[in-house]
């Protein structure tokens, strides 16, 4: 099976699919991540691959301009950021296979018109072994093949929070005063902040495999 990973970044989801024996083709404009294609997704020629070439497509478009916490770095380019997401959805539609696209649940992407009506699941990273909460929305077409763990909340807290009433780290770099999100001055590294929990990635990869297999003709 083959997966296409758009905005591969640190390769969290790539590794999960590779652990299941999938061939992964990745795209990112940052050469430091060693993607298969170093390219801007807006100009990348995805039609070099035929429809059906991939059995799953994953997208992690940059969340910077969708972040409600953005206070530096110049004006917010919401139009440009939304165009990247539109291009991602265009590519997913072209290949006609199950797909998933993630972005912070607290961001502005979920309010954009192009996302309305798309199926999604919300997850929190702390439920998958990370020391901070980071509520994330995963739009996807995995249907009943993926049943994510409950979102961390007072009614269903993750283990670290239920034991101590606080998450050991914050999902923000630098100082934070968010209640329940930080302890003893700890904060996560940039590498970890830009990664996804392996447990979550493995769960999604397994669900993708199940979704693909359910589409195969019965023998």
Predicted regions and their residues:
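Conserved active-site and SAM-binding loop architecture
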Residues: 1-219
């Amino acid at each position: 099976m083959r997966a296409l990973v758009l905005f591969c970044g640190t390769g969290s989801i790539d590794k999960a699919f590779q652990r299941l024996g999938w061939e992964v083709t990745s795209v990112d404009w940052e050469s430091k991540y060693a993607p298969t294609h170093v390219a801007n997704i807006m100009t990348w020629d995805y039609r070099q691959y035929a429809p059906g070439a991939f059995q799953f497509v994953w997208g992690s478009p940059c969340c910077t301009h969708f972040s409600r916490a953005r206070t530096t770095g110049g004006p917010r380019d919401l139009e440009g950021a939304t165009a990247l997401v539109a291009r991602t959805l265009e590519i997913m539609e072209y290949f006609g296979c199950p797909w998933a696209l993630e972005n912070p649940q607290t961001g502005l992407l979920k309010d954009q018109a192009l996302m309305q009506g798309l199926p999604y699941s919300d997850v929190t990273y702390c439920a998958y072994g990370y020391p901070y909460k980071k509520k994330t929305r995963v739009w996807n077409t995995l249907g009943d093949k993926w049943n994510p763990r409950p979102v961390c909340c007072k009614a269903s807290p993750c283990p670290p929070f239920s034991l101590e009433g606080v998450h050991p780290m914050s999902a923000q770099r630098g100082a934070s005063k968010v209640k329940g999100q930080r302890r003893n001055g700890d904060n996560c590294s940039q590498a970890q902040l830009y990664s996804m929990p392996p447990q979550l990635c493995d769960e999604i990869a397994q669900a993708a495999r199940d979704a693909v297999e359910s589409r195969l003709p019965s023998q």
